[in-house]
Amino acid sequence: MNLVLLSGGSGQRLWPLSNDIRSKQFIKIFHREDGELESMVQRVYRQIKAVDTDATVTIATSKSQVSAIHNQLGEEVGISVEPCRRDTFPAIALAAAYLKDVQGVGEEESVVVCPVDPYVENDYFEALKALGDRAAVSSANLVLMGIEPTYPSEKYGYIIPIGKEQVSKVSMFKEKPTQEVAKDYIAKGALWNGGVFAFKLGYVLNRAHELIDFVDYDDLFNKYDTLNKISFDYAVVEHESEIEVMRFAGTWKDLGTWNTLTEAMDSHAIGEALFNEKCENVHVVNELDVPILCMGLKDVVVSASPEGILVSDKEQSSYIKPFVNTLDHRVMFAEKSWGSFKVIDIDNASMTIKVTLNAGHRMNYHSHQHRDEVWTVIAGEGKTIVDGMEQNVKAGDVITMSAGCRHTIIAETELKLIEVQLGEAIDVHDKQKFELEY
């Protein structure tokens, strides 16, 4: 199975846990069988491999999410990196070119495209495999997944099939309707459009070449910022007459708001939280190092992270986006390919950050033009390289780097340090990377 997972969005509806770097698919809220927490993307990737160990998985995403993907899934997963956001058709076209020119997938092979963050069980991925198998032999150019609706939703588009068979031709598509119109659609056998497409790779590449002047993957990547923003539905689906839909009746949820997300949580608290006996239907997600105490609350979600604190009625939590848009969006926590960082304090001429490096990983070898840095190791062991000079470090060691100094740190065990940045103009873009043979 060749599977492309679309991973985008800034996830403002799940503030304060999500931001421009950490979208909802990277938030760790699900318990695995061993008790450890996993994110939506980790859960989905695990389920895919449980169904098809040989599945080729490519994640189409923006540059800002690459580090988080490597942190959570490892370095082996394929990533088609969008230089900028251009909606789903350019993203799928770039991923298709990546599959052909980088991964070596043949044009007659089938490809399935789906969102990275559905809340589903393994039968969903078994259905995706069947969808890809159907696309490989069908005379239709596109095979879509239609979700059997469980209620008349206003949040989804609808697919109207010609018949009621497991696989049938598509009669028409309908945009997100009112609840009353949705009831009428469902009575006529309509299915939710889950944003899942299957096709032969050559079909989408041919369509991409018709709409975009490019030679190969590298050429398309280099001119990506000149492409028009357009969805796959508008660019391809609406102009295709040979389309089939395959029904799916299993569990399928879009966890796009705090209300729907808490419905899928298997415990009322993640992180340190305490409830009195008067609390009813209350969920807490706490990423801070201090406890949250809830007394006499009903139908409430409480979420706390370095980005901020949300206390909301669950129904009202669906409407937080315009309020979040008014807030300062400085990133206070992020996962990197080598570990993670959390901003502890910001002052006029300094910033203090807690950094965690995973064992066997290191930062880029880099320098800053406008700031000095001081590292204080608080746990673990490793090695620093400062202007080519190596030094073993452990808890209690302090390393000072002046502006212009090239430096990195390598973690031999999990390593934690406090980084203090000092300067009048502290800027995330003040960073120059260098090659390091190590």
Name each model-derived stretch.
Residues 1-5, 15-20, 30-113, 119-126:
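Conserved N-terminal catalytic core of the sugar/cofactor nucleotidyltransferase
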Residues 41, 95, 117, 159, ...:
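Residue-level signal for inorganic ion chemistry
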